[in-house]
From Swiss-Prot:
Family of this protein: Belongs to the ThiG family.
Record CDD domains: ThiG
Summary of subunit composition and partner proteins: Homotetramer. Forms heterodimers with either ThiH or ThiS.
Lineage of the species this protein comes from: Bacteria, Pseudomonadati, Bacteroidota, Flavobacteriia, Flavobacteriales
Protein's name according to its UniProt entry: Thiazole synthase
Listed GO biological process terms: thiamine diphosphate biosynthetic process
């Protein structure tokens, strides 16, 4: 399985993880290590940015793990930009998962505010990974604005409904000149495998692992599914046929 790059970092694992909803920080750490993930996202609202004493950070200090702070909770571009600047100063990283969702019920990303924030954050030197609707036009606009990757949703955050936006994801993957990371709604290892078979560069998973009966084992399952899906993509999947085609034709043998 080939590695891939997002700006200045090379990743061997194509499985990125979220850190919310786990029963404990210890459980979270075990799942992350079992997954082989090299990039984990953490909400700024969960960290004491002044002292960095939040226990979650202690469980994420591993050589292979890179932190991706996110702006979850930001309702507009102004709030997201402010949060991004705080994160860069406190965590010493210019990497950012940009999340702007003003509606607390459905957590749908605000496309207009996300584009606005991306334009400003790119000027400030941030490496931006925006969480967005699976909108091919928006993805191209964000690319032009300076985003380092795009993170279109498969279905609503935490829904575990899988790839409900697959038709649009296919277009995004075909057109994108930056890495495509499918985020939100991936509820089973089979969903992750499908995303990789489509040609996505990576997937980000949280809820499906965090609330599983055995998060560590589920993390291992996702790791294997992502690897299998990516290998299938690299091997070039056989095209689907509209009618049956025998793998071992016997016509000539039968009628000799």
């Amino acid at each position: 399985m080939l590695s891939f790059k997002i700006r200045d970092k090379t990743f061997e694992s194509r499985l990125f993880l979220g850190t919310g909803k786990f029963g404990s920080n210890q459980q979270m750490e075990e799942a992350i290590l079992a997954s082989g993930s090299e990039l984990v996202t953490v909400a700024l609202k969960r960290i004491d940015l002044e002292t960095q004493t939040d226990a979650i950070l202690a469980h994420l200090k591993h050589p292979r793990i890179n932190l991706l702070p996110n702006t979850s909770g930001a309702r507009n571009a102004k709030e997201a930009i402010f949060a991004a600047q705080l994160a860069r100063e406190a965590l010493e990283t210019n990497w950012l998962k940009l999340e702007i969702h003003p509606d607390p019920k459905y957590l749908m990303p605000d496309a207009i505010e996300t584009l606005k924030a991306t334009e400003e954050l790119a000027k400030l030197g941030f490496i931006i990974l925006p969480y967005i609707h699976a909108d091919p036009v928006l993805c191209k606009r964000l690319e032009e604005a300076g985003t380092s990757a795009v993170m279109p949703l498969g279905s609503p955050i935490g829904s575990n409904k899988g790839l409900k936006t697959i038709d649009f994801l296919e277009i995004i993957i075909e057109q994108s000149k930056v890495p495509v990371i499918i985020d939100a709604g991936i509820g089973a290892p089979s969903d992750a495998a499908k995303a990789m078979e489509l040609g996505a560069d990576a997937v980000l998973v949280n809820t499906a692992i965090a609330i599983a009966g055995n998060p560590k084992l589920m993390a291992e399952a996702f790791k294997e599914a992502v690897m299998a899906g990516r290998k299938a993509y690299e091997a070039k999947l056989a095209q689907k046929a509209s009618q049956a085609v025998a793998s071992s034709p016997l016509t000539a043998f039968l009628y000799e």
